[in-house]
Amino acid sequence: MTLGALVNGTLQLLWPARCAACDRSTPDGTIFCDECTPSLSVLLGACPGCALPRADWNALRGRCGLCRRIPFSFCEARAAYEYGAALADAIVRMKHGQRWMARRLGPLLVPALMDALARGGFGADDVVVPVPLHARRLRERGFNQALELVRAALRDIARTRALVVAMPRGLPRLERRLLRRTRATKALGHAGPAARMAEVAGAFALAPAAAERVRFRRVLLVDDVLTTGATANECAGALMAAGARDVHVLALARAV
């Protein structure tokens, strides 16, 4: 047994891992317990334009009815899971100040992140940008959950040789302060796309002198939850206006 394995085993005995959703003990160190894991729903059959699982998206045209009605500024969107049940509980806990939860959920993003980077043709010259919080919200929460999620996922990829080899063009650079939220926006609950888009209009901009770091580059915009696409669309608009080559969106979960 290696020293690392011995240390990890000892820590597990002293402080056993607990389910991210319900706090039950998970002796094998998994993120969710045996009772909560079955509730996780991998997102399948989703529209490549907005990541919404819909029966009306046309495989030939590649977009659903929503995407054809709304001219999103991002070129595609994907999510790892449907938002609900145990994952929703864990995300809510994360947003209520549990920073360690963001780091723990990060590995769930790895497969979808690898897929997004490969399909989008990303390389070392491109950038990953987390959706920013407003400065006031960041002070209240103490961290940006989107940043913590994608940072943990990228760290997992960088530490796994097989995953690094699968990215021959290299991993894109994480830009944590490239985009900023210029004003606070209201929580809109179950509001529809039109109301959400009106609320976030003009709420995002590039940081001063940041345009050079995005111009002619592919951008992967990452958030914890994709709801209607309004926030991602506004962020993508600011990035495209600064000269980004294109913007792809990735979320841990998609509200359906």
Task: Please name every model-derived segment.
Residues 1-256:
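Glycine-rich phosphate/pyrophosphate-handling loop used in enzymes and phosphotransfer proteins
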